[in-house]
């Protein structure tokens, strides 16, 4: 049986969007399992807060500002991880953006919000993978895990965000096929509703959608972090190009989620 406390000993890991929520939970889980983690986020104080909390636990973590929409910033983050840890073995793409929709009609969506959401949520993953791939291949145990959403699998509203998350599924499959010969595995985790800062002050909404989940609860960031850690580890050594849905059974039934929300304009992820 694998010792879960040491699955990533000696591994260098870079996590984007790690200043809060799912990204922070992923950084924490990898560090707890032995990884040396570069916590990156656009919000410098939040990234440093997460890294400092990990260091206080005796874990290895550094923080760096990274804007995944900027190639130079992404390149600098990858270089920092390699310089700090000696190798880059794990890349976890958590950074994303979801613009509020202008209205319930598809034709109301402005070009600007579409371009912004896709450039960060999909384009950002592309930039990070491009920068990291040579180092992941050199490590001999490289793994990429990106955070998708059930929005990319079924109709949960929010056109731009859903399109970007669906694109991640296709990117994951094509990149997995092209990276396998280099020894790099590429997978995707698709969460349902997870209790993050995006839902702060929206307890009524959470209560409304909770009953849509067969397992009877909303997901926690740690639920997603556990799935990411599995896919990034050697326990998943024969898994690549797949989407692991972590949604409390939502997509198995899809029981009226959109009608439970505000006009169906908000997705679960």
Predicted regions span which residues?
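Catalytic loop of short-chain dehydrogenase/reductase
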Residues: 97-98, 145-167, 172-181, 193
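Substrate-binding pocket helix/loop in short-chain dehydrogenase/reductase
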Residues: 102-106, 110-118, 209
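Alpha-helical segment proximal to the catalytic Tyr-Lys
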Residues: 134, 177-178, 237
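C-terminal substrate-recognition "lid" of short-chain dehydrogenase/reductases
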Residues: 217-246, 251-252
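Conserved glycine-rich cofactor-binding loop
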Residues: 12, 19-21
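Short, small/polar-rich loop/turn modules that mediate ligand/substrate recognition or access, typified
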Residues: 141, 180, 185, 239-241
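Short C-terminal tail/terminal secondary-structure segment
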Residues: 2-5, 103, 240-269
């Amino acid at each position: 049986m694998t010792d879960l406390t040491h699955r990533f000993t000696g591994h260098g890991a870079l996590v984007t969007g790690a200043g809060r929520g799912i990204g922070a939970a992923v950084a924490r889980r990898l560090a707890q399992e032995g990884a040396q983690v570069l916590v990156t986020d656009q919000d410098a104080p939040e990234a440093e807060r997460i890294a400092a909390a990990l260091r206080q636990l005796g874990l290895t973590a550094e923080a760096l500002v990274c804007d995944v929409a900027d190639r130079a910033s992404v390149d600098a983050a990858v270089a920092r991880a390699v310089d700090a840890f000696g190798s880059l073995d794990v890349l976890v793409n958590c950074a994303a953006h979801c613009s509020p929709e202008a209205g319930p009609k598809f034709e109301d969506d402005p070009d600007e919000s579409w371009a912004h959401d896709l450039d960060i949520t999909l384009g950002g993953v592309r930039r990070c993978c491009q920068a990291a791939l040579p180092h992941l291949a050199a490590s001999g145990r490289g793994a990429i895990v990106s955070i998708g959403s059930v929005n990319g699998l079924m109709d949960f509203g929010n056109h731009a965000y859903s399109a970007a998350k669906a694109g991640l599924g296709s990117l994951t499959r094509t990149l997995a096929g092209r990276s396998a010969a280099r020894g790099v595995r590429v997978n995707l985790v698709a969460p349902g509703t997870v209790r993050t800062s995006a839902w702060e002050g929206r307890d009524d909404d959470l209560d409304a959608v909770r009953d849509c989940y067969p397992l009877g609860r909303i997901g926690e960031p740690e639920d997603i972090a556990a799935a990411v850690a599995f896919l990034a580890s050697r326990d998943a050594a024969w898994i690549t190009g797949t989407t692991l849905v972590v949604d409390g059974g939502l997509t198995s039934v899809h029981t009226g989620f959109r009608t439970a929300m505000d006009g169906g304009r908000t997705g679960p992820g």
